[in-house]
Amino acid sequence: MSARIELNLEADVRPPGEDCRALVARIAASPEFQRASRLRAFLAYVVDRKLADCPDEITEVLIGHRVFGLPIDYNPGDNSIVRTQARTLRDRLERYFRGEGAHEPVILEIPRGGYVPVFHLREPVSQHMPVPVSHHGTATVRERPPTRRHWLYLGASAAGLSGIALMRALRTAPTANIAATYSPARVELESSDANLTQAFSQAKQRAMQCVYGGDPIGQWYASDPISRVFCMRDVAHESFGAAVLGLEHHTENMLRRFAASAAASRKWCGFWTITKDGFPSPDTYRDNTDFGYCLPANFDLVRACYQQLRWTGNRAYLDAVFSGFYDHSVTSYVDAWDRERTGWMKANAAFRRVHASYNQRPPQFATSADLVGAQYAAYLAYAGIQDLKGEPGSLSRRMAAEYRAKAAALRSRFDSDWWNAAENRFYSGILPDGSLSSEYVDQSNVYALWFGLPAAGPKIEASLDQMERNRPHYDSTYSYFPEVFARYGRNDRAYQGILEIAGQSSNYPRGETAFAALGAIASGLMGVDPDVPNRIIETLPRLTGEVAWVRLSRLPVGPNEIAVEHHGTTATSFTNQNGPPVQWRPVFQSNGKRFAHAVMTIRGGETKRATLA
């Protein structure tokens, strides 16, 4: 009889190989599979169908049709390609787990006589999860971990498990998701301004053309309607607009894949692009020494995950896969790319396709303003995540305070060391020879503002003026403009930017501008700022003279659908259209000062109003 291994479902245990798809990605990246695209597709398909609890789709005929492109009515007796490829796949899996994957505690195999993959443990898992080590070399412990699905009983034959229980154990989606299950794209906008209404409609239509399902990767969206890959930077940026459309499950799926892909063998970089089949794109990944990446991406992803947690309340973003990624991104990742311990992360010439900036054109920086900005934003996001994990006085709360202090120190140093007084703007980056580059690089400077790096004051205003004078080379960079201008009070410029990028979305091949327009309308123009874990939603009207009133309705926020209606910048109404009671904090701005009302409780179906006194 096969040995059975039982794990405590409620204990804070992270068995190795918890994310099956991460295991498949490592297998696909190994020398045994790198140049075997059909075997990778075969493996991705059968694992995906198993995780989707669809074993009836793992048949010879369907594999032949969906993986190898054979007609749906082909006769397996006349074509043995599936059986032949299955034998090769089994052999290569066996070689992987004997060789490069000899360290893998979880083994994946496809038993002879069928095509349904099975997972089992090479050896019993310890009941105590290894404690993560901080960059100071001291152990850290997370308080109050969220409940997760764990591997239940895994053995050579998964004996003792029902099929349903096994599938639940293998799924990566956690149980603690409190987000609503409303259909995507129910959100609507009405306004006195026909241009704004049209812009919203165009952006919504274009964005939904970039949304996919039914691929081995699961639910996902891309930066253009014909893409078959998704990119880490694009997803981090598009996730704000995707939240407006109710695509929280698509977003979590993609962010999880990126988080799981970060590895010590690549100095904690993840995969820059992932295909619809769940593998790193060969254009950006050849092996662990030759891959394309931009160093701000890890930090951008940490920030995006935290924003999704605040918007959706989905505590999956606190599980082991994500938490491990956050921990490594603010510790091991920083150390790996700051070898000289100067406090600035730097690109390493040994990794020729790893860039310090999202800007990949000359000049090539060793360190960039957008990298520093992303690191600053990630430290603040990490602090917010730690706040959600611990009680007052706990280690998590102390870590939150530590990383807020780190963020403040980074901002202060940037403010003093990177200011170009001669040109009244910040430098864009540090060159490989250690000098500050005098060239203005739009991506570096715009993203630094996007991440909120510069402190408020005259330098911010000068930086915004510089943005106004320097139209970016890339429309994708320009798509960041509206929200940046809205955040810093230039509402007229934000409004014009929204109309421009939404108009681009109707004829521009990339859908990124569409997602950006939706995000800028909701969080910029409407000022919707949810904090679902704490049951508070804040609003701040940033309308212009062209817009007398605007109403955004059926907006999914956590388990609720809400409607927010602004009349100018002095009156707001809030409706809880669906869901449990929420707390609303109306905020207004006048003459550069913020005025916040007392928090109101809004029950389901109820509407309340607030005005600037």
Regions found by a protein language model. Give the residues of each.
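An N-terminal, helix-rich hydrophobic module
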Residues: 2-125
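N-terminal export signals
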Residues: 144, 150-171
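Low-complexity, Ser/Thr/Pro/Gly-enriched N-terminal "stalk/linker" regions
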Residues: 173-230, 253, 413, 418-419
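Active-site acid/base region of carbohydrate-active enzymes
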Residues: 183-205, 245, 258-271, 306-370, ...
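Active-site core of glycosidic bond-cleaving carbohydrate-active enzymes
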Residues: 199-201, 228-264, 320, 324-331, ...
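The feature captures the catalytic groove of carbohydrate-active enzymes
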Residues: 217-228, 270-300, 315, 331-404, ...
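Non-catalytic C-terminal accessory modules of carbohydrate-active enzymes
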Residues: 491-613
